[in-house]
């Protein structure tokens, strides 16, 4: 299995922890370092472009997008979250490999920390498990 991970640099303390969780979980389930391609993009809105480029230009079986958007005082949060969600849905509807949604959307930094290795676990771990399961699903159909 070959995995691609596209990570937003924005809120790097959160996205870094999510990335660490995802990579550790992939390795725990047998993925080799050389079969995990990690690329960064500046912000969460660029995640779908990065995933699309990875899909078109890499030999990958599944892609995980990792980002963190924390609500502020303007509608920017809503636009970014909706754009990324629609972008990932479009990639999954039209692409040949699964794109796993690892965008953390919270009201506060504390809520994000809770989901990035804090009291609610690490959503990066969950994304890695989902990627493995989706590769298994695709491979089971191609036998």
UniProtKB/Swiss-Prot annotation:
Disulfide bonds: none annotated. It catalyses: (2S)-2-hydroxy-3-oxobutyl phosphate + 5-amino-6-(D-ribitylamino)uracil = 6,7-dimethyl-8-(1-D-ribityl)lumazine + phosphate + 2 H2O + H(+). 5-amino-6-(D-ribitylamino)uracil binds at residues 10, 44-46, 68-70, 101. Keywords: Riboflavin biosynthesis, Transferase. Pfam families: DMRL_synthase (PF00885). One of its GO terms (molecular function) is 6,7-dimethyl-8-ribityllumazine synthase activity. (2S)-2-hydroxy-3-oxobutyl phosphate binds at residues 73-74, 115. Pathway: Cofactor biosynthesis; riboflavin biosynthesis; riboflavin from 2-hydroxy-3-oxobutyl phosphate and 5-amino-6-(D-ribitylamino)uracil: step 1/2. The keyword Transferase applies. GO terms for cellular component: cytosol; riboflavin synthase complex. It comes from the Bacteria. The keyword Transferase applies. GO terms for biological process: riboflavin biosynthetic process. NCBIfam families: lumazine-synth. HAMAP family: Lumazine_synth. Catalyzes the formation of 6,7-dimethyl-8-ribityllumazine by condensation of 5-amino-6-(D-ribitylamino)uracil with 3,4-dihydroxy-2-butanone 4-phosphate. This is the penultimate step in the biosynthesis of riboflavin. This is 6,7-dimethyl-8-ribityllumazine synthase. It comes from Bacteroides fragilis (strain YCH46). The lineage of its organism: Bacteria, Pseudomonadati, Bacteroidota, Bacteroidia, Bacteroidales.
